[in-house]
Amino acid sequence: DAVVSRGLGDVYKRQDHSGVASGFVHIFNHALIKGGLFMAVGYFAILYKDRVTLNSLKGFGYKYPITSFALLICGLSLIGLPLTNGFISKLYLFQALYTNQMYLSIALVAVSSALAVVYFWKIVEQMWFSEIKFKSEKEDTYIYLPIWIVTISIIVFGIYSTPIIEFSNLSADYLISGYQN
């Protein structure tokens, strides 16, 4: 996020439309992704009745499969898997950075994506590949339903991103050229 913020600050100073628009796309998409992740982990904290640590997630993929699968989709979106809004974010960020010849920023975004793969894999490993395999427990619909609304939005905006992109382009126009009546 810090890398993206720095890059966006640079493109804003240059008043580059593609950079500002990609920043808006990223802010929207990233908010959905992180919102879904935090909601899922928050639900695990309620179920676990304690602070959630990496070790406490052992077997949760089997114990709470509905919420765990939502967390998996959100995490894959954070990494930038195609058909998720995270992929759209990364695609537009890379295009804007390349257009502005910001090759160091491209490398930093690529490294941060690789790090996301590493740390998210540790979560997946604990949830599904640890020795502990629980029997599935009933999950509260009123809690996992909002998590899944966000998760489905992540997929929908990954497949049909036109409204977000158009709104981001319009917002970039207004920000760069100023609102004219």
Segments (PLM) and residue ranges:
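Single conserved hydrophobic/aromatic residue that forms the stacking wall/gate
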Residues: 1-12
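Interfacial and helix-entry/exit segments of alpha-helical transmembrane bundles
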Residues: 6, 35-106, 135-153
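Hydrophobic alpha-helical transmembrane segments of multi-pass membrane proteins
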Residues: 24, 28-32, 41, 107-115, ...
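Cytoplasmic/organellar membrane-interface segments at the starts of transmembrane helices
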Residues: 50, 62-67, 121-181
